Protein backbone atom coordinates (compact mmCIF):
# COMPACT_ATOMS: atom_id res chain seq x y z
CA UNK A 1 0.00 0.00 0.00
CA UNK A 2 1.01 3.61 0.62
CA UNK A 3 3.58 2.60 3.27
CA UNK A 4 5.31 0.28 0.79
CA UNK A 5 5.45 3.06 -1.85
CA UNK A 6 6.92 5.52 0.69
CA UNK A 7 9.49 2.96 1.82
CA UNK A 8 10.45 2.27 -1.78
CA UNK A 9 10.77 5.98 -2.52
CA UNK A 10 12.91 6.60 0.55
CA UNK A 11 15.16 3.68 -0.37
CA UNK A 12 16.17 5.40 -3.61
CA UNK A 13 16.30 8.97 -2.26
CA UNK A 14 19.99 9.01 -1.27
CA UNK A 15 21.01 8.08 -4.83
CA UNK A 16 19.09 10.99 -6.38
CA UNK A 17 21.97 13.39 -5.58
CA UNK A 18 23.93 13.80 -8.87
CA UNK A 19 27.13 14.64 -6.99
CA UNK A 20 26.91 11.43 -4.98
CA UNK A 21 26.37 9.36 -8.12
CA UNK A 22 29.32 10.92 -10.02
CA UNK A 23 32.82 9.46 -9.57
CA UNK A 24 35.47 11.96 -8.39
CA UNK A 25 36.99 14.03 -11.20
CA UNK A 26 40.37 12.64 -12.17
CA UNK A 27 41.87 14.46 -15.18
CA UNK A 28 44.09 12.40 -17.48
CA UNK A 29 47.83 12.39 -16.99
CA UNK A 30 49.68 14.77 -19.31
CA UNK A 31 52.16 12.88 -21.49
CA UNK A 32 55.90 13.54 -21.54
CA UNK A 33 55.80 14.76 -25.15
CA UNK A 34 53.16 17.32 -24.18
CA UNK A 35 55.34 18.67 -21.37
CA UNK A 36 58.26 18.93 -23.79
CA UNK A 37 56.16 20.72 -26.40
CA UNK A 38 54.57 23.16 -23.98
CA UNK A 39 57.85 23.84 -22.22
CA UNK A 40 59.42 24.73 -25.56
CA UNK A 41 56.47 27.02 -26.28
CA UNK A 42 57.16 28.80 -22.99
CA UNK A 43 60.82 29.08 -23.99
CA UNK A 44 59.80 31.03 -27.11
CA UNK A 45 57.61 33.33 -24.98
CA UNK A 46 54.41 31.64 -26.15
CA UNK A 47 51.64 30.58 -23.78
CA UNK A 48 51.99 26.95 -22.62
CA UNK A 49 48.85 24.82 -22.74
CA UNK A 50 49.32 21.80 -20.47
CA UNK A 51 46.18 19.72 -19.89
CA UNK A 52 45.29 17.12 -17.33
CA UNK A 53 47.22 16.42 -14.16
CA UNK A 54 50.61 17.74 -13.20
CA UNK A 55 53.71 15.72 -14.10
CA UNK A 56 54.60 12.50 -12.36
CA UNK A 57 57.87 12.14 -10.47
CA UNK A 58 59.31 10.09 -13.34
CA UNK A 59 58.27 12.69 -15.91
CA UNK A 60 59.99 15.42 -13.89
CA UNK A 61 63.13 13.31 -13.70
CA UNK A 62 63.05 12.68 -17.46
CA UNK A 63 62.59 16.39 -18.21
CA UNK A 64 65.46 17.30 -15.89
CA UNK A 65 67.76 14.71 -17.48
CA UNK A 66 66.88 15.74 -21.05
CA UNK A 67 67.32 19.47 -20.45
CA UNK A 68 70.58 18.90 -18.57
CA UNK A 69 71.91 16.70 -21.38
CA UNK A 70 71.20 19.43 -23.94
CA UNK A 71 72.97 22.05 -21.83
CA UNK A 72 75.96 19.78 -21.11
CA UNK A 73 76.43 18.76 -24.74
CA UNK A 74 76.22 22.37 -25.94
CA UNK A 75 78.83 23.38 -23.36
CA UNK A 76 81.12 20.57 -24.55
CA UNK A 77 80.86 21.69 -28.17
CA UNK A 78 82.19 25.11 -27.17
CA UNK A 79 85.57 23.58 -26.31
CA UNK A 80 87.64 22.60 -29.33
CA UNK A 81 89.68 19.44 -28.87
CA UNK A 82 90.01 17.22 -25.79
CA UNK A 83 88.22 18.48 -22.68
CA UNK A 84 87.65 17.36 -19.11
CA UNK A 85 84.35 17.54 -17.24
CA UNK A 86 84.36 19.50 -13.97
CA UNK A 87 81.84 17.74 -11.73
CA UNK A 88 82.21 20.27 -8.91
CA UNK A 89 81.38 23.19 -11.20
CA UNK A 90 78.45 21.27 -12.68
CA UNK A 91 76.99 20.59 -9.24
CA UNK A 92 77.56 24.20 -8.18
CA UNK A 93 75.62 25.40 -11.23
CA UNK A 94 72.43 24.08 -9.61
CA UNK A 95 72.76 26.34 -6.57
CA UNK A 96 69.99 28.72 -7.65
CA UNK A 97 67.30 26.06 -8.26
CA UNK A 98 66.06 25.84 -4.62
CA UNK A 99 65.79 29.64 -4.42
CA UNK A 100 64.01 29.76 -7.77
CA UNK A 101 61.58 27.06 -6.68
CA UNK A 102 60.80 28.99 -3.51
CA UNK A 103 60.12 32.13 -5.57
CA UNK A 104 57.79 30.19 -7.86
CA UNK A 105 56.03 28.64 -4.86
CA UNK A 106 55.47 32.09 -3.41
CA UNK A 107 54.33 33.58 -6.75
CA UNK A 108 51.96 30.70 -7.57
CA UNK A 109 50.16 29.72 -4.35
CA UNK A 110 47.31 28.05 -6.25
CA UNK A 111 49.35 26.22 -8.90
CA UNK A 112 51.20 22.94 -8.45
CA UNK A 113 54.93 23.61 -8.12
CA UNK A 114 55.58 20.47 -10.19
CA UNK A 115 53.66 21.99 -13.12
CA UNK A 116 55.84 25.10 -13.03
CA UNK A 117 59.03 23.05 -12.70
CA UNK A 118 58.15 20.77 -15.62
CA UNK A 119 57.63 23.76 -17.91
CA UNK A 120 60.58 25.74 -16.54
CA UNK A 121 63.06 22.90 -17.06
CA UNK A 122 62.28 22.78 -20.78
CA UNK A 123 61.66 26.51 -21.24
CA UNK A 124 65.37 27.19 -20.82
CA UNK A 125 66.34 25.02 -23.79
CA UNK A 126 65.64 27.46 -26.68
CA UNK A 127 67.74 30.29 -25.23
CA UNK A 128 70.59 27.87 -24.52
CA UNK A 129 70.49 26.44 -28.04
CA UNK A 130 70.51 29.88 -29.68
CA UNK A 131 73.09 31.66 -27.52
CA UNK A 132 75.40 28.69 -27.04
CA UNK A 133 75.02 27.91 -30.72
CA UNK A 134 76.55 31.31 -31.47
CA UNK A 135 79.37 30.61 -29.02
CA UNK A 136 79.97 27.18 -30.60
CA UNK A 137 80.12 28.71 -34.07
CA UNK A 138 82.63 31.27 -32.80
CA UNK A 139 84.78 28.63 -31.09
CA UNK A 140 85.00 26.59 -34.30
CA UNK A 141 85.79 29.59 -36.48
CA UNK A 142 82.47 29.63 -38.32
CA UNK A 143 81.71 33.25 -37.41
CA UNK A 144 83.82 36.18 -38.59
CA UNK A 145 86.49 36.96 -36.01
CA UNK A 146 85.09 40.43 -35.43
CA UNK A 147 81.71 39.20 -34.15
CA UNK A 148 82.43 38.02 -30.61
CA UNK A 149 85.92 39.49 -30.41
CA UNK A 150 84.24 42.89 -30.39
CA UNK A 151 83.45 43.83 -26.78
CA UNK A 152 80.17 45.51 -27.72
CA UNK A 153 79.01 42.48 -29.68
CA UNK A 154 79.96 40.11 -26.86
CA UNK A 155 78.17 42.20 -24.23
CA UNK A 156 75.19 42.57 -26.54
CA UNK A 157 74.85 38.79 -26.88
CA UNK A 158 75.28 38.42 -23.13
CA UNK A 159 72.53 40.98 -22.49
CA UNK A 160 70.18 39.27 -24.95
CA UNK A 161 70.79 35.97 -23.14
CA UNK A 162 69.92 37.32 -19.69
CA UNK A 163 66.93 39.32 -20.92
CA UNK A 164 65.60 36.23 -22.68
CA UNK A 165 66.04 34.03 -19.60
CA UNK A 166 64.44 36.67 -17.37
CA UNK A 167 61.51 37.25 -19.74
CA UNK A 168 60.79 33.52 -20.05
CA UNK A 169 60.77 33.10 -16.27
CA UNK A 170 58.56 36.11 -15.58
CA UNK A 171 56.11 35.34 -18.38
CA UNK A 172 55.77 31.72 -17.27
CA UNK A 173 54.65 32.58 -13.73
CA UNK A 174 52.36 35.27 -15.13
CA UNK A 175 50.54 32.95 -17.56
CA UNK A 176 50.25 30.31 -14.84
CA UNK A 177 48.20 32.74 -12.78
CA UNK A 178 50.52 34.85 -10.62
CA UNK A 179 49.15 38.26 -9.64
CA UNK A 180 50.88 41.40 -10.89
CA UNK A 181 52.44 42.01 -7.50
CA UNK A 182 53.75 38.47 -7.20
CA UNK A 183 54.91 38.46 -10.83
CA UNK A 184 56.89 41.63 -10.13
CA UNK A 185 58.34 40.09 -6.98
CA UNK A 186 59.33 36.96 -8.88
CA UNK A 187 60.95 39.10 -11.58
CA UNK A 188 62.98 41.01 -9.00
CA UNK A 189 64.10 37.81 -7.30
CA UNK A 190 65.01 36.21 -10.63
CA UNK A 191 67.08 39.27 -11.58
CA UNK A 192 69.00 38.98 -8.30
CA UNK A 193 69.67 35.27 -8.88
CA UNK A 194 70.86 35.90 -12.43
CA UNK A 195 73.12 38.70 -11.23
CA UNK A 196 74.64 36.52 -8.51
CA UNK A 197 75.19 33.70 -11.00
CA UNK A 198 77.04 35.99 -13.39
CA UNK A 199 79.08 37.60 -10.61
CA UNK A 200 80.05 34.73 -8.34
CA UNK A 201 79.75 31.45 -10.23
CA UNK A 202 81.71 30.00 -13.12
CA UNK A 203 79.34 27.84 -15.15
CA UNK A 204 81.94 26.41 -17.55
CA UNK A 205 81.75 22.70 -16.84
CA UNK A 206 84.17 21.69 -19.60
CA UNK A 207 87.83 22.74 -19.61
CA UNK A 208 90.26 22.22 -22.45
CA UNK A 209 92.94 19.68 -21.63
CA UNK A 210 96.47 20.95 -21.88
CA UNK A 211 98.65 18.94 -24.21
CA UNK A 212 101.76 17.50 -22.69
Name every feature range the model reports, one short phrase each:
Residues 67-71, 96, 100, 127-131, ...:
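Alpha-helical transmembrane segments of multipass membrane proteins
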Residues 6-70:
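N-terminal juxtamembrane cytosolic/stromal segments of multi-pass membrane proteins
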Residues 183-202:
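Internal/C-terminal transmembrane anchor helices
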Residues 79-147, 156:
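Alpha-helical transmembrane segments with an aromatic anchor "belt"
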Residues 161-188:
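Cytosolic-side transmembrane helix boundary signature
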Residues 69-82:
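Juxtamembrane "helix exit" motif at the C-terminal ends of alpha-helical transmembrane segments
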Residues 203-212:
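Membrane-interface segments at or immediately adjacent to transmembrane helices
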Residues 51-55, 108-116, 174-183:
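Membrane-interface helix-boundary motifs at transmembrane edges
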Amino acid sequence: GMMQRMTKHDHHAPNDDPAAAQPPFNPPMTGLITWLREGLRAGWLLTPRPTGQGPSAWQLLALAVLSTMVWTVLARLQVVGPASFDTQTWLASWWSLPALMWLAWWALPFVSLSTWLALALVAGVPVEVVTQGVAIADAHGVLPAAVLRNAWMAWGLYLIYWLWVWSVGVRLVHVLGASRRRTAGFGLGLAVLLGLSAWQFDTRVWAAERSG
